[in-house]
């Protein structure tokens, strides 16, 4: 278990939870997360997860992602954002002999704009961000519609969304170069951009004043541009996490 993997998962879980209306200025917690990777013969990861959330008038922070509000009111929230993208591939971690001869794919820092618009029927959440560390040089656009239901201490937020990956993003994480093909025996592959729909559900229950338990899950149906890669043997990816937090 590396610190990078643990913290990166924390970002993913914070992002998946879709916390746009914070219920407190600052909260700390811990939990456990399960991540299903799309790569061939790649084990499901189970990680402990730190939870650190802060919501202010000008700044917000969740996991290893944060932002500065350019506009912030009850209806609309626009911010400059940066976050650590947890997507990665380590050749030595694959159980497939051919996959072990591929190059590693690194996780990276993404930066861009995020926007949320709230109505009585739910809210729109969208983020457009690009790689800042010259790894993939890719762009990712995520857009979702969510509805928050609250009953006493229970809050449930289902959502449906779609993620667009640029050609560079898919090329880096799912493409197979000529050199890799010659080394591994896998066929070369050059994907285009893609759209992948997803469903997500998050829930929290407040008990004993400032203590809460939470759970979140996301199911992503991978596009053909991803599933056609010889690196991939699944049609979906998934995330489940649960834990406990304390609000200050």
Swiss-Prot record:
Keywords from UniProt, A to Z, are:
Cell outer membrane, Membrane, Signal
Keyword Cell membrane assigned: no
Signal sequence span is: 1-22
Per UniProt, subcellular location reads as: Cell outer membrane
In the record, biological process GO terms are: peptidoglycan biosynthetic process
Show the InterPro entries listed in the entry. MipA
Supply one GO CC term from the record: cell outer membrane
Concerning Pfam families, the annotation shows:
MipA
The answer to keyword Signal applying to this record is yes
Cystine pairs: none
Molecular function GO terms recorded: protein-macromolecule adaptor activity
Q: Which domain of life is it from?
A: Bacteria
Q: What exactly does this protein do?
A: May serve as a scaffold protein required for the formation of a complex with MrcB/PonB and MltA, this complex could play a role in enlargement and septation of the murein sacculus.
> Subunit details for this protein?
Forms a trimeric complex with MrcB and MltA in vitro.
List, alphabetically, the PANTHER family matched. MLTA-INTERACTING PROTEIN-RELATED
What protein family is recorded?
Answer: Belongs to the MipA/OmpV family.
Output this protein's name.
MltA-interacting protein
Give the source species: Escherichia coli (strain K12)
């Amino acid at each position: 278990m590396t610190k990078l993997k643990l913290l990166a998962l924390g970002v993913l879980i914070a992002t998946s939870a879709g916390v746009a209306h914070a219920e407190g200025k600052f909260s700390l917690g811990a939990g456990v997360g399960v991540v299903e990777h799309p790569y061939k013969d790649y084990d499901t990861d189970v990680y402990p997860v730190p939870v650190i959330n802060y919501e202010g008038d000008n700044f917000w922070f969740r996991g290893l992602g944060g932002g500065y509000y350019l506009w912030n009111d009850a209806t609309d929230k626009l911010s400059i954002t940066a976050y650590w993208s947890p997507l990665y591939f380590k050749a030595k971690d694959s159980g497939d002999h051919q996959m072990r001869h591929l190059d590693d794919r690194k996780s990276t820092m993404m930066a861009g704009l995020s926007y949320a618009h709230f109505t009585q029927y739910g809210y729109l959440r969208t983020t457009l961000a690009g790689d800042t560390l010259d790894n993939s040089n890719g762009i990712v656009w995520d857009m979702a519609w969510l509805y928050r239901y609250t009953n006493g201490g229970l809050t449930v937020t289902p959502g449906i969304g779609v993620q667009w990956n640029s050609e560079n993003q898919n090329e880096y994480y799912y493409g197979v170069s000529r050199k890799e093909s010659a080394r591994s025996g896998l066929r070369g592959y050059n994907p285009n951009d893609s759209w992948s729909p997803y469903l997500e559900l998050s829930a929290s229950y407040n008990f004993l004043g400032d203590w809460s338990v939470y759970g979140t899950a996301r199911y992503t149906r991978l596009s053909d541009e991803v599933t056609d890669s010889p690196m991939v043997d699944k049609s979906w990816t998934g995330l489940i996490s649960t834990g406990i937090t304390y609000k200050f």
